[in-house]
């Protein structure tokens, strides 16, 4: 991991001023520092998983919990009825900029379809 990738570890340990909106033993969710929508939340596992390709039999429940928490946050933010987007990027060509598995929850306005 390089310094850019370590930022998520610092957020989990609350070593930054990042606004954490949810944290449990499995995941941490926080507001994106450069939001692409009125609501832009990042959900990460509390243990290091590099990419979607690294989800396996042992850690697949972590991924399911990430998705569950993203939906729970969407409901709490009152965007679940109007709609929201969950985005995950994998590796360089997939647009992943930080080498740490993370999920973007975007909403609060009409979002453009990717396809």
Curated annotation (Swiss-Prot):
Matching Pfam families: HIT
SUPFAM superfamilies to which the protein is assigned, alphabetical: HIT-like
Domain HIT: 7-115
MF term (GO), any: catalytic activity
InterPro entries, per database record: Histidine_triad_CS (IPR019808), Histidine_triad_HIT (IPR001310), HIT-like (IPR011146), HIT-like_sf (IPR036265)
PANTHER family: HISTIDINE TRIAD HIT PROTEIN
Full protein name: Uncharacterized HIT-like protein BUsg_345
Species whose genome carries this gene: Buchnera aphidicola subsp. Schizaphis graminum (strain Sg)
